[in-house]
Amino acid sequence: MSEKAILSCRNLGKSYEEGPESVEVLANLQLELHPGERVAIVGKSGSGKSTLLNLLGGLDTPTKGGVWLDGEELSALSEKKRGLLRNRALGFVYQFHHLLPEFTALENVCMPLLIGKTAIPEARQRATALLERVGLGHRLEHKPAELSGGERQRVAIARALVNNPGLVMLDEPTGNLDSHTAEGIQDLMLELSTSMRTAFLVVTHDMNLARQMDRVLQLQEGCLTPI
């Protein structure tokens, strides 16, 4: 693709010191994602998928190589600038929704906008529109404990997308759901990725979900290979 990548990493490596030993988790890893592209990463437990996501999201620093998000090298930014870039250009969805329990669905979705200094009326308007889009217009004032598992994950997806980021990273987004609910969440993610032209990077054990992506990569022995 000639279009500028929304996310890229070059020669990415990560190792940890365990006593006198250095344990290499990732080695010379290469990856590019372009606007609107959907990529799945699969691999056994302990293969380094969570480590990779933390590096790609700027939550950890590599031992070697670098990560570029929306043209900015993450390790070259201050912690404050990294946080602002993440809030603007990146959304996260986890297996467990990580919604704030004391806030309503609407308030949870407003959070990234308010962090980015969006005025409260505009934040509420945009969050309401997105919650309606994911089928939760009737649940705006409900707190997470009052929502089903599938509804909570829809709120989490709306929160990840409310700033219209170029990329959303999803870590086992259907792993905590029954098969019927998981299928509905899959369909929603694919529709939103297409209509909003948002790149999705999905880490999953669910090969049915992985096959819905444009590419599937396996993380094994610290490297990514197409499958």
Swiss-Prot record:
Its EC number is 7.6.2.-. GO terms for molecular function: ATP binding; ATP hydrolysis activity; transmembrane transporter activity. It holds the Pfam family ABC_tran. Its main location: membrane. GO terms for biological process: lipoprotein localization to outer membrane; protein localization to outer membrane. It is a peripheral membrane protein. ATP binds at residues 43-50. It comes from the Bacteria. InterPro entries: AAA+_ATPase (IPR003593), ABC_transporter-like_ATP-bd (IPR003439), ABC_transporter-like_CS (IPR017871), ABC_transpr_LolD-like (IPR015854), LolD_lipo_ATP-bd (IPR011924), MacB-like_ATP-bd (IPR017911), P-loop_NTPase (IPR027417). Residues 7-227 form the ABC transporter domain. GO terms for cellular component: plasma membrane. It is found in: Cell inner membrane. Keywords: ATP-binding, Cell inner membrane, Cell membrane, Membrane, Nucleotide-binding, Translocase, Transport. PANTHER family: IMPORT ATP-BINDING PROTEIN, LIPOPROTEIN-RELEASING SYSTEM ATP-BINDING PROTEIN LOLD. The complex is composed of two ATP-binding proteins (LolD) and two transmembrane proteins (LolC and LolE). Part of the ABC transporter complex LolCDE involved in the translocation of mature outer membrane-directed lipoproteins, from the inner membrane to the periplasmic chaperone, LolA. Responsible for the formation of the LolA-lipoprotein complex in an ATP-dependent manner. Belongs to the ABC transporter superfamily. Lipoprotein translocase (TC 3.A.1.125) family. This is Lipoprotein-releasing system ATP-binding protein LolD. It comes from Pseudomonas fluorescens (strain Pf0-1). The gene is lolD.
